[in-house]
């Protein structure tokens, strides 16, 4: 996306803000009118030349901006995934493509219930698996019988995507579609089209089907083989008959391939851009996979990233799983620099598809809320899967988690404690179209509230459509006891960064930009308070007799990774314990490291903000040197 001078002049205000703070006194800010620090045209993609130096590459990186569609997708922040299909009834994660359509034995459907629950969670869009890898379609396609039209649901006339589209309109949710390029039915069926070695010939999209005319009379001519024609005919259906589509999701997973089948992605892209100009494309140049399916996030998630070939023309988009994608070191290896945001995706259940309510565990509210803060507050979008059950509804446990997550989001992020504060108006007006340019000599922003406020969350946004994501390192300070005290640090900011830290009470806060790529433009800061609570604890002893006291981990066994959820959410708690049977208090010994204990009763409690958590107690029997002991069950 190019930004010319006319566009820049439309920005309401741009200021160079340098704040000077003396002992106990806030001086007036130096606020000279200024434009963004631009030395090149801002673009979505910029080529690296052989003559470029590390310095000129960083200059180019500082001018990479999201497209309008990418920016709208970033504003969605929290979105839903829905995996539904034959796998829901066979209890499989991946089907084989040869399932009898009648295994999809759906009797009732309540997409209003889906949308009501998603809306309650604070989600803004839902992406629906219209066709998963098994090739089974959940809409009334003209081009196959392998789908819902061959089931008993509503006598073969049901259309789940149509129901969902209507519910999205009713509840104010955007709609996206997942259409798997992989198609096991078209691979395994004797007359299947996938990899059938058909010649590429000029073909019209959509292909006419007697008795099923399209209201949209747009047509395309492409050189296609049989499978690409089939795939694009179905894309045409999805993009023209189910309301505005805001995202098209192409999964890179392929359970099986055949016949050297290739995809004509340039044709797919042309069709999408023509029929759904507002849509972003996942798995291609607009949005990338985060690199895992567990909800794990990078500490530094750059969206300005290097490419070995032009992402605007290539059809090859490999998965990016490295921890470091966009550092200076990585960018200097590039042939092209490109803006491409990540979706942090995972499932609320153990698996993408629903299996049961007894053994398939559901993520805790703490877990989902923690991922939300790390993803949305870490320069990415949170995509959470909620699989409907065999009754066509979200299960009660899933709905309960969604509602509580939405409640926490509202309770935490509704009241901005910087409202009414003194500071740059452009940062406090709740308008991301206004901004200040920070630097170059004094990269500090000071905000003063009328009265002391207690906060533990601080939100920062860069004006990334104006001058890219530039901040590389920053810190937040609070004025406490007549001195600045650092309370949190972070690396990049980009679209949004949420800093989390223990409760701090002050009426003066300072944001310091420590490192950046040219002068960054900051468009918003806000301060919030999360109702942190002392976490539950557990006591363990190893075979050497060393006792550890830690936060209790949720029992969730799907795509796990190391993450102390309780500590992330409730920063600043302390653990106190006793070994003599007495009830622990704030005066009891503080737990800081494992300790040796031959036998005895360990009682422990977490304390946070003068609040006391549940007491955890465990009787440890005499240690057996062969590694066995008389340890009794955990008691509450």
Predicted feature descriptions by range:
Residues 20-21, 25:
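Hydrophobic helical h-region of N-terminal Sec-dependent signal peptides
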Residues 28-29:
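C-terminal motif of bacterial Sec signal peptides marking the signal peptidase cleavage site
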Residues 34-441, 445-474, 478-502, 512-523, ...:
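Mature catalytic domains of secreted/periplasmic carbohydrate-active enzymes
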Residues 530-636:
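Short, compositionally stereotyped local motifs that mark structural "simplifiers"
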